[in-house]
């Protein structure tokens, strides 16, 4: 298998305190073309996922098939229910309570068929509850949950925010032009009013000069057949 093929496979984190069950689930997952990381406790699973079990002071490292004290990206978690320290249900609650991990599908396994336990896990976010021994047919059920999450990832990405609303530039330009035109029209009307007023004022002054007493008593010259004559 090429490196590209290996990287393109879904990555499953398997958690089980039983070495035999852990090896079985690892084999089934690999036969189903999944990339697998296994750990033997819920606290180690949290450590690999970037969370920390507050009640676990153990310094032991994960199993040999897992990276040592590294945060890893996984596409699905499959965990045993009955484990010492942290149960599979406790691990489910921690994962679903994390803002960064809550979308990772979690599948729980158990050798005990307890309906109340099964219902509680499914109601609190588990995708499936498998009864042990786990079969190859169970592994095929995982793909639908993996594909569902893969389709949800692009949809979950935040849509780009709309740019802040800006006034329409064309409308702003039109408003500016209209305002300038109005101002120009007002100026023309004002000029016309001033011009008319000046003409009326000049006509009044001319009339006043004509009707002035000095102008009426002033002698006027008139022409006759014998020459010029003075009229009073």
Swiss-Prot record:
Gene3D superfamilies: 3.40.50.2300. Transmembrane segments: none annotated. The modification 4-aspartylphosphate is found at residue 80. Residues 11-147 form the Response regulatory domain. It is found in: Nucleus. One of its GO terms (biological process) is phosphorelay signal transduction system. Residues 153-174, 202-232 are annotated as: Disordered. Induction: By cytokinin in roots, shoots and leaves. Two-component system major event consists of a His-to-Asp phosphorelay between a sensor histidine kinase (HK) and a response regulator (RR). In plants, the His-to-Asp phosphorelay involves an additional intermediate named Histidine-containing phosphotransfer protein (HPt). This multistep phosphorelay consists of a His-Asp-His-Asp sequential transfer of a phosphate group between first a His and an Asp of the HK protein, followed by the transfer to a conserved His of the HPt protein and finally the transfer to an Asp in the receiver domain of the RR protein. Pfam families: Response_reg. Residues 209-232 have a biased composition (Polar residues). One of its GO terms (cellular component) is nucleus. Its main location: nucleus. Keywords: Cytokinin signaling pathway, Nucleus, Phosphoprotein, Transcription, Transcription regulation, Two-component regulatory system. Expressed in roots, leaf blades, leaf sheaths, shoot apex, flowers and panicles. Functions as a response regulator involved in His-to-Asp phosphorelay signal transduction system. Phosphorylation of the Asp residue in the receiver domain activates the ability of the protein to promote the transcription of target genes. Type-A response regulators seem to act as negative regulators of the cytokinin signaling. Belongs to the ARR family. Type-A subfamily. This is Two-component response regulator ORR4. The lineage of its organism: Eukaryota, Viridiplantae, Streptophyta, Embryophyta, Tracheophyta.
């Amino acid at each position: 298998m090429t490196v590209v093929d290996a990287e393109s496979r879904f990555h499953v984190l398997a958690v089980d305190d039983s070495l035999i069950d852990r090896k079985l689930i690892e084999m089934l997952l690999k036969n189903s073309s999944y990339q697998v990381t296994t750990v033997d406790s819920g606290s180690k699973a949290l450590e690999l996922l970037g969370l920390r079990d507050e009640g676990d002071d153990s310094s032991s490292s994960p199993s040999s098939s897992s990276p040592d004290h590294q945060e890893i990206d996984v596409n699905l978690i499959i965990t045993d229910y009955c484990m010492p320290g942290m149960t599979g249900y406790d691990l489910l609650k921690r994962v679903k309570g994390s803002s960064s991990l809550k979308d990772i599908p979690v599948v729980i396994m158990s050798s005990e068929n307890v309906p109340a336990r099964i219902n509680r896990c499914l109601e609190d976010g588990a995708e499936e509850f498998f009864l042990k021994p786990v079969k190859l047919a169970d592994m095929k059920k995982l793909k639908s949950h993996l594909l569902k999450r893969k389709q949800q990832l692009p949809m979950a990405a935040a849509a780009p925010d709309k740019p802040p609303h800006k006034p329409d530039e064309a409308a702003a330009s039109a408003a500016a032009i209209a305002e300038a035109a109005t101002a120009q029209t007002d100026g023309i009307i004002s000029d016309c009013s001033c011009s008319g007023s000046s003409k009326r004022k000049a006509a009044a002054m001319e009339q006043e000069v004509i009707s002035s007493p000095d102008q009426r008593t002033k002698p006027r010259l008139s022409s006759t057949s014998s020459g010029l004559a003075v009229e009073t």
